[in-house]
């Protein structure tokens, strides 16, 4: 008899709406590329654009193509180039593109394990505070020419 009394409760539980798991935060990665580097180079550089679906942070990057990868920034205080590691990674604001580009934030491949040849691919795994990791192949290509470069201008 007690089993029959539980039957309506079980039936109601089976009909109740199930709670859906919240959608996982995501980060879109576009325009990923790396500069060429000769075999034996001490470092290489990669660039990309990140757009997060919610506030997040790029925390670390890994690549089998290098001993390790660091997130760096570069600036020119007083006309002297200074590069430093961003130990806290890169803050990502929901819906805003965060560019890692020449002359600014970038990924530094420390101890590339071989030549980064034009047309080659560099596998990268990006890890975030909230979003799942993103693995991609960045193409090795020549950097774009500066917008101000011209045939008659001197480059110092």
Task: Identify what each model region corresponds to.
Residues 8-9:
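Residue-level signal for mature regions of secreted extracellular proteins and peptides
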Residues 1-4:
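Positively charged n-region of N-terminal signal peptides that target proteins for export
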Residues 22-156:
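Compact, glycine-rich, soluble single-domain proteins
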Residues 15-19:
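Bacterial signal peptide processing site
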């Amino acid at each position: 008899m007690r089993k029959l009394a539980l039957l309506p409760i079980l039936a109601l539980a089976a009909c109740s709406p199930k709670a859906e798991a919240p959608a996982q935060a995501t980060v879109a990665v576009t325009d990923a590329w790396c500069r060429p580097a000769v075999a034996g180079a001490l470092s290489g550089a990669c660039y990309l654009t990140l757009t997060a679906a919610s506030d997040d942070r790029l925390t670390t990057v890994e690549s089998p193509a290098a001993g390790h990868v660091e997130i760096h920034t570069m600036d020119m205080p007083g006309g002297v180039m200074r590069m430093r590691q961003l130990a806290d990674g890169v803050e990502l604001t929901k819906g805003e593109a965060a560019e890692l580009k020449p002359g600014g934030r970038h990924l530094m491949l420390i101890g590339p394990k071989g030549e980064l040849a034009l047309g080659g691919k560099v596998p990268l795994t990006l890890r975030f505070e909230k979003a799942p990791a993103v693995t991609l192949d960045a193409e090795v290509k020549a950097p774009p020419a500066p917008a101000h470069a011209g045939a008659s201008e001197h480059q110092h």
